[in-house]
Each structure stands twice: as C-alpha cells, then as structure tokens.
C-alpha cells in the first residue's frame, strides 16, 4: 500500500493525495454477493429531505457482507481482497471448505491465501471470529456485536479497533476508539485484530467534484442564508451569527449532547466525553 501525491497538473489535482493498494482485485466483484442499491438522495418515503447534503454520485452495487461469521469450525481461505465503494474498509472474499463464498471486512495483515476460522475453538489470530467469552482480556478486536447473533455493529471502519478490558459475569467491558467504555454480552462475537486500510484517513480529496462522485452535496453556511432558512441568516452584508452556534432547527451544536436512548444507557460505563 502506497501514498501517492498527484502531480499538480490542475488546481483540482494540486492537493490530491491517493492511497494505492496494488494487492486489491482489479476485476469485477463476485456476482452472487451483489445486491441493488437505489439512491435515496437523503429523502424519506414522502419525498422530503431528512438528511441534508446527499444526492447524485456514481451508481454502485451493494456488497453483501457477512457480519455474523456463524460458519463455526469450517476453515475459510482468503481468495482476494477487494475495494468496496460502500465503506472505508476493504473487503475480503473468502472461500469456505464446503464451497460457499462470503465477503467479510478485511482485517489488517490478512493476505491472500491465509486461512480463517470462526467459532469458540478458533485460534487467537488476526481475522478469526470468536465469542467474547473465549477472547483473552487485553486483545485488540474489531467488528463487535452489540446483541448476540445480530451481527457486527461496532469498530467496522478502516483502521479502527477496540480493546477487551475485562469480563464480569455475563458482560465484558470494551474500550472503543472514541474512548467510550461499553458493556457487551460475552456471547457477542468479535474478530481478532484491527480493520485494514488504515491509511484511508491520509487521503486528500483534492477537489469538490470528487465528493460529488461519492454522493456528497455542498454544505452551505448558516450565515450565508436568509433568516427564514437558518437562525444565523440575514443581516446587511457579511455579519457574524450573533448567537451561539445552532443547527437550522435551533439545536445547539459543538458539544451539545443529543443522545436520548435511555434504554441502553446502562451499557455505557464511561462516555467518550471527558466531562
């Protein structure tokens, strides 16, 4: 994997930095593991915008990822590593001994031809998936389930990981990359090691058009709007907001806590916020 600074042949390419991985598969993805993906452009079923700054972008198929890793005791060989336009991490196509193929999140250090395993008897090696009760304390893990059998939901982005801190009864404590310490049931599964493609954060988009290819539309500042459109809008000429920063709906931003899920608050041992 190499970091390439593009030659400044145009203003849009002057600041562009690419991450090139020559180990990725250059052909088409595995057709049996593709699904259609319609662009919603940030609209709900009424056609109203519910998520701003989304729309356009290149069409692409969804790669069906195996987040459960439930084929216990069946060895799987990594056939190839692939690029996935739907996520920051790369994916790996694995071939199980019974002939089935599945996509998984590609862990750091996993290479083509390597053998992976799932289940409570799997060795503690990068890329293997085990229940948390069978993972030694202090192990670096990723792709962590929040409920047993639901599939991995935490630590799935490129370069991320978590650490298993302790086990108490039927729960274990996991420290996430954000600093949050969370309780997870010991029957939940996790994968050993870190997520690969850790250089993803070093890339530079270089130009606005590259974000448009990804389906990201422009973000307009509130102070540049009219008063009807944003609490910061209006004024004669260039003016400051005149108040503490808020969202278009008046909710304070920059540190204001918006978490309202009281049902799972007991699962958070230490919040990611320092105070």
Curated annotation (Swiss-Prot):
- Spell out the GO cellular component terms annotated for this protein, sorted alphabetically and separated by semicolons: large ribosomal subunit
Q: Which SMART domains match?
A: Ribosomal_L2 (SM01383), Ribosomal_L2_C (SM01382)
MF terms (GO), sorted A to Z = rRNA binding; structural constituent of ribosome; transferase activity
Q: Which Pfam families match?
A: Ribosomal_L2, Ribosomal_L2_C
Bias-annotated ranges (Polar residues): 38-53
A GO term (biological process) for this protein? cytoplasmic translation
Keywords, comma-separated and alphabetical = Ribonucleoprotein, Ribosomal protein, RNA-binding, rRNA-binding
Region annotated Disordered sits at 38-59, 224-257
Q: How does it assemble?
A: Part of the 50S ribosomal subunit. Forms a bridge to the 30S subunit in the 70S ribosome.
The function of this protein is: One of the primary rRNA binding proteins. Required for association of the 30S and 50S subunits to form the 70S ribosome, for tRNA binding and peptide bond formation. It has been suggested to have peptidyltransferase activity; this is somewhat controversial. Makes several contacts with the 16S rRNA in the 70S ribosome.
Q: Which family does it belong to?
A: Belongs to the universal ribosomal protein uL2 family.
What is the protein name given in its UniProt record? Large ribosomal subunit protein uL2
Report the gene name: rplB
